[in-house]
């Protein structure tokens, strides 16, 4: 199977960039799915209770929902010590992921080992702001490792939350 990229030379900065951003997109999908599974398990188990009004769909609302559930629902408080730091890690990685995915490439090649993107932040009822975002080869190994860890740690937590809710009728 070949997924040739027209106009992109093998081994070029663009090929490296496309591979890195592609990895971020695919691995983030796997990692964030763990949040979706956790939210779905809780939502279906507790449906109808005051805390559970609407299933969250955006990352921030999922993180807020899960944090609140771990703090306020007795069956889930056992996950608070582990869950809250994990949710914080998701928030940090999610911002970087959003910057890369929703930013536009600003330079045709890496400069000083970094690809630069321009990101427009939309601020309702205010002026938009434009900022530079960098995908730096020195930061890449740690970010790649964090994305892999979020997938693993998130899936583990999702399974344990689901299993704990099966035990508590």
What are these regions (language model features)?
Residues 1-26, 30-169:
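Acidic, Ser/Thr/Gly/Pro-rich intrinsically disordered interaction regions
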